[in-house]
Amino acid sequence: YSRSNSAESNILTEKYIKKIAGFFIKKNMKIKLFINTIGFLHDDKHLPEKKFQDINFEYMKKSFEINTIPTALMIKYFSPLMAKDEKSIFATISAKVGSISDNFLGGWYSYRASKAALNQIIKTASIEQKRINNKLIIVSVHPGTVSSKLSKPFIGKKEVQTPEESAKKIIIL
């Protein structure tokens, strides 16, 4: 399909993810590029935890409900719709802090854990999908530090890129 299409959905429910996939099925569309940009780090009530005692059940649950579970469901419903006769890509935005081996600072328990779980889902799904559609690449991408509402409270003096700059770098991959 040569033109981009967007469909609004409530990303937190399986019902709506399935409904959006149904939109593509009805149009008999095969997807060549799927980019999932869903992400959550903080809200008005909670900032990332600095120590273990700061862990809050609702905040941690929300982190997984937004950062992890919808992507698993998107893979479930959209991977069968990905093109099989040519290379297709299912990419999801993740975060370097989701790397277990790259954790040198600690803290941010809910965000780190939800992104680590996301990365594991991506890795496991990519292995499974190779057996089903060897033209499909399932990958997670760290976009770098991007100037956004998500990162604004934590940027400090770090080098920051605009969303457009980050998107250009991701597309090059």
List each language-model region with its residue ranges.
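Conserved active-site helix of classical SDR/Rossmann-fold NAD(P)-dependent CH-OH oxidoreductases
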Residues: 72, 116-127, 164-172
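Hydrophobic structural elements of the Rossmann-like NAD(P)H-binding subdomain
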Residues: 35, 91, 138-141, 151
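Catalytic loop of short-chain dehydrogenase/reductase
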Residues: 40-44, 48-64, 86-132
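A glycine-rich helix->loop->beta "capping" turn
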Residues: 23-38
